[in-house]
């Protein structure tokens, strides 16, 4: 028995909208549901409604159905020609590629020059090395054309032969059964792996692969200011091309070791500076380490813990050359764990006084400095 038109099943016209299809499906599914309907053929009608909705609610399936009818309703062409699909999921993509792809379109020459592959190499730098940059000589494993056979893969004194199975084209014709009849598809020749050539006597060095694995030394310039996770592109130092094609690029990925004192935030450097209570309360001038050398920093009296000071131009250079970052110094008060009796008495005196005069500050400063 031939299938009814899906639009007819749902009681719709071909121009029905998505909302109209949904409404029709809900109404008919409820009407013919086996648990509700008393009609004799309710199960068959319910299945028919489900099948129609499955196709018409999917834009791709609906387009195929509108063009090809029931033959194109499902991707696998299930049910066409008395049952079964063609090759377990042979769909429209396969058919159209057969018509317009491998056999009918422009075919690439299997022996044409092809570019090689990109390579990646990881390096680890110290914090200061990333700030100031450096030159590295790295040794990377690469596949280069075989020197013995000059990249041909054939034993010296011999040459490749034209594949007899594909007549040097690199492709063979394969017949396939489709819903539209028998078609001829073109695919890569299995005897020559799509190259169109056979190596009778292989090179003893590369065993016919035309390439050999070796380690190559490459000079890499690490720019100043590079940050963790960034990469450097070294043009033309990737894997060699095929059939005389150009080499691709080498990408050097940089990892930066953590520093015991400094942290990096973009072009800026952050550090924490421990100070005593007396230094914070009374003020002081301290030496602060930077990657460019020590600099003096004036701490105003009454500075609170967590206060941030900026040292302009003492950060990392921008890796693209756009100026220089700054260094930010965050001061933290260090509470002593061991106090002398004199220091304890002074702190109790300080805590008990409502007005803090200069004489008490002087005593505190001398006590904490051990004077």
UniProtKB/Swiss-Prot annotation:
Entry keywords, A to Z: Chaperone, Cytoplasm, DNA replication, Metal-binding, Repeat, Stress response, Zinc, Zinc-finger
Name of the featured protein: Chaperone protein DnaJ
Function (record text): Participates actively in the response to hyperosmotic and heat shock by preventing the aggregation of stress-denatured proteins and by disaggregating proteins, also in an autonomous, DnaK-independent fashion. Unfolded proteins bind initially to DnaJ; upon interaction with the DnaJ-bound protein, DnaK hydrolyzes its bound ATP, resulting in the formation of a stable complex. GrpE releases ADP from DnaK; ATP binding to DnaK triggers the release of the substrate protein, thus completing the reaction cycle.
Gene name linked to the record: dnaJ
Chain sites annotated for binding Zn(2+) 2: 163, 166, 189, 192
ZnF CR-type: positions: 133-215
Subcellular location: Cytoplasm
MF annotations from Gene Ontology: ATP binding; heat shock protein binding; unfolded protein binding; zinc ion binding
Subunit description: Homodimer.
PROSITE patterns with a match to the protein in the record: DNAJ_1, DNAJ_2, ZF_CR
An individual GO BP term: chaperone cofactor-dependent protein refolding
GO annotation, cellular component aspect: cytoplasm
Homology family: Belongs to the DnaJ family.
Primary residence: cytoplasm
Amino acids binding Zn(2+) 1: 146, 149, 203, 206
Stored HAMAP family: DnaJ (MF_01152)
Entry cofactors: Zn(2+)
